Amino acid sequence: MSYDLLLAGGDVPGVGRRDVAVHGGLIAAVAPELPRQARTVVDVTGRLVTPGLVDLHTHVGPGYWGIDPAPIAWYTGVTTWVDAGSAGAYTMAGLARGTEVRIPALLNISAVGLTGRTGESRDLANCDVDLAIETVLADRERIRGIKVRIDAETVGPNGVEPLRRGLTVAAACGIPVMVHVGTAPPAVDEVLDLLRPGDIVTHCASGIASPLGPAALAAHRRGVLFDIGHGSGGFAFDVLEAQVDAGMTPYTVSTDLHARSVYGPAFDLPTTMAKLLAVGLPLADVIAAGTVHPARALGLNAGTLDVGAPADLAVFAVEEGRFEVADAHRQTRTAPLR
């Protein structure tokens, strides 16, 4: 068989040296050695070949936090940018649809979305369950979950009520909730106790709200997915290390990339992934946390090199050494790769 594209001699994490062939926009074959019968053959010996990266928590919509993904996507290998709550029911129509990258969305339970820095769920009139359900069902292919930010500034005296409403919407539509945890009140345990298997807690190792106690362990054991969500203040090495030691390894790694984190401390998804390597997580596990795991969490057809899957690929040059990386609180560790 003749292929459209053959990536020859690359290293697939957890598998080893492989050739990857593409035909008709799909992955046609993956094997230790394939015939050099392709319209284009690219020698990627010594390079890392992965599915296109899937960033589960970004902000690419209009508003206070939003950035343009296009200038960053090409050199970071991130082909799927999940917009995590920039838009609510009032503003979803203004959220960009991907051209060069895919932009699935998590609908903010607050209909105003993230038009400002915070406070979107202080007025419960904006957390309209029926309107949110209607919005999801009208755009179900794009809207893959519900986003709720729970911290003192965002919800004010409303506590976990916005989360309860988000969970009602999610249950009605058969989708997960991603909840941002931050400064109490409400307490992080009160938030975790409400989450269902398949729901996502982002900023899981923030150092601000640190899920480390019995409620966190119980949530992790029942299938609540822990997501890094680095951002400008959402990641602390010491908290992540304690979680890993307790058996609460994060399921997904994401950047929470936005206008206040893109120039540091998060920078981009490969840089954030290197920080997981710096605490001792294996490369293959870190790659999975940035590809197949976020895709599974939202039911996306992405994140895999399986034959027949879309030919959504990334190729990385990898340098071995000792590279200092910093979290959001200026703690540093040493990563073995970049």
Task: Give the label of every model feature segment.
Residues 10, 25, 46, 57, ...:
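Divalent metal-coordination and catalytic microenvironments
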